[in-house]
Regions:
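Flexible acidic/His/Gly-enriched loops in nucleotide-sugar-dependent glycosyltransferase catalytic domains
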Residues: 20-22, 33-41, 65-69, 73-134
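Short alpha-helix within the catalytic core of nucleotide-sugar-dependent glycosyltransferases
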Residues: 10-14, 46, 59-71
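Conserved nucleotide-sugar donor-binding catalytic segment
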Residues: 42, 100, 104-184
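Short aromatic/hydrophobic "clamp" motif used to bind/position activated sugar donors
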Residues: 49
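Short, acidic/glycine-rich phosphate-metal binding loop used to engage nucleotide
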Residues: 4-6, 26-33, 37-38, 57
Length: 303
């Protein structure tokens, strides 16, 4: 798929398709990744869809390994792979994207993905292969104020689709300061939080947790902004927990702010983690585990 390129890419693709009849080249009739994806998928003649960006590189074994996995595991709807973060810009080698890749590469099993889906995107878009039937059943990529791939994953998962990730690096994912995910509003943190809120309510209902009192870890600026987005999607935070003595005892939108030491199974609450730097997350998990709280049953990371 050529999405309005102006650097000779289309001619290069035509040349390749002339040498290998398995390659078919199309130009997207409109501009933008969503239109290009849906247009290309609509012209595919296969059970499975795999894609990647023009600046990424996949290992020669990628398609075979993913095809074989889906063929051998018909209960699985989407299979991803681990990825290697690559950049020619030194200041991006230790950026948030590289930390995200490190996190994502540890999210492998169906259970891992279910618990991680609202923390960040659990699979890297150019690393996936999935059943084309998913799109016919649940709809294709959507254009809107949200990341089109993350919204699609949450939609699939909300319908019961099964995801798996191979414990194998099969893609080199190239990063640059000019990439869309760094510069377009639909990939902002606020857009991700909005997308999470759209699907979290149905997840809580599916897990039988909607009857519990929904509380939040964090009462700072980032957490309260996230809480407002949740409220707009019918998820009302009844109580906030924090460690800051200047916040404890106050209220946020009429909800009390309490000390994290008051967190207890006896409260019959479900806790949404709305704040916490990457380096702090293991400490939060350890704290909650010591209080006998179980991820997915008593708490869930949303940040």
């Amino acid at each position: 798929m050529d999405d309005d390129s102006s650097d000779g890419t289309y001619d290069l693709l035509l040349s390749a398709s002339g040498q290998d009849k398995r390659i078919r080249t199309y130009r997207s009739p409109a501009k933008g990744i969503v239109d290009a994806l849906n247009f290309g998928i609509g012209r595919s003649r296969t059970r499975f869809i795999a894609r990647m960006d023009a600046d990424d590189r996949m290992l020669a074994s990628r398609l075979r390994k993913q095809f074989d996995y889906l063929s051998a595991h018909p209960e699985t709807d989407l299979v991803a792979s681990q990825v290697l973060h690559k950049s020619d810009e030194d200041d991006l080698s230790s950026s948030g994207f590289s930390h995200y890749v490190e996190w994502s590469n540890q999210i492998l099993t169906e259970k891992d993905i279910d618990l991680a889906q609202f923390e960040e995107s659990p699979v890297v878009h150019p690393s996936v292969m999935y059943k084309k039937d998913l799109l016919a059943t649940y709809g294709g990529y959507r254009d809107g104020p949200f990341p089109e791939d993350y919204e699609l994953w949450l939609r699939f998962l909300s319908k019961g689709a099964k995801f798996h990730k191979l414990n194998d690096i099969l893609l080199e994912w190239f990063d640059s300061s000019g990439r869309a995910t760094r510069n377009q509003s639909q990939y902002s943190q606020e857009a991700f939080q909005y997308t999470k809120a759209l699907y979290l309510k149905s997840w809580l209902i599916e897990k039988g947790l909607d009857g519990k009192s929904i509380c939040a870890w964090g009462a700072g600026e980032i957490a309260t902004k996230h809480a407002k987005i949740l409220s707009q999607n019918n998820i009302r935070i009844k109580k906030f927990y924090d460690i800051d003595p200047l916040k404890i005892g106050k209220t946020v939108d009429m909800a009390p702010v309490c000390n994290i030491e008051e967190i207890s199974l006896r409260n019959h609450e479900f806790l949404l983690i709305l704040s916490g730097a990457r380096s702090i997350k293991p400490k939060i998990r350890s704290f909650l585990n010591k209080k006998k709280l179980i991820a997915g049953e008593h708490y869930l990371f949303l940040a």
